[in-house]
Amino acid sequence: MLYFFLLYVKKKYILDRYEKEKKVIAYYVNNNERIMEQSNKALHEKYEFCNIRRDEIEQAVKIEAICFPPNEACTYEHMVPRIENAPDLFLVAVDRKTGKMAAFLNGLATNREHLTDDFFTNADLHDPAGANIMLLGLDVLPEHQQQGLARELMEQYKEREQVKGRKKLILTCLPDKVEMYKKFGFKDHGIGDSVWGGEAWNEMDIVLE
């Protein structure tokens, strides 16, 4: 069955999402014509953006192990309950040519205001009605980098959660990634409470307006 709905996300554009078999494809609509910036159009032609499926857990764990060192990467033990508790907060990009996952962005909902290390290991902290999202990982395989995939995942995530009424997205990152997230619209609040993996992490957030 095909579901159709329109979401006003920009003054000029309407986001026209079609959901089929839990897969989401996005187009921008203006004056009843489907349009999309060329960069986005190219990405959507190459990748399918959708919520993760249960049978993709192994892929997600392997990608996490490639993108993060062992002291930081989410293990299978913690990835499974994260996906089971909040599959709608696990956005993936699937390479249309290979059918394999190329990247993902995931998180948990909560009313808490700061990202602490327990979110990385305890998916039961997820509150479906939570006002904020703790982003727990943005992973892009090396061979799929340098084409705007991380930015596109983040933009789609922001739009999805804003429509749901979320207030903020919150993340932690190492200092060398702060500038990248600033370009995505996040505000840096300096070193936060997290010491995940024995590291000092900057806490950043973005208000969804």
Q: Model-predicted segments: where are they?
A:
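Polybasic, lysine-rich low-complexity intrinsically disordered segments
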Residues: F4, K11-Y13, K20-K23
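A short beta-loop-alpha structural element at the N-terminal edge
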Residues: K46-A60
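Helix-loop element at the rim of GNAT/NAT acetyltransferase active sites that forms part
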Residues: K62-T75, R82
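Cytosolic beta-strand hydrophobic patch enriched in CBS
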Residues: F90-D95
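Conserved acyl-donor/pantetheine-binding loop and adjacent beta-alpha core of acyl/acetyltransferases
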Residues: T98-L138, Q145, E155, V195-A200
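Conserved catalytic-core motifs of GNAT/GCN5-like acyltransferases
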Residues: A109-R112, I170-T172, K182, K187-E203
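Conserved GNAT acetyl-CoA-binding A-motif
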Residues: M154, E161-C173
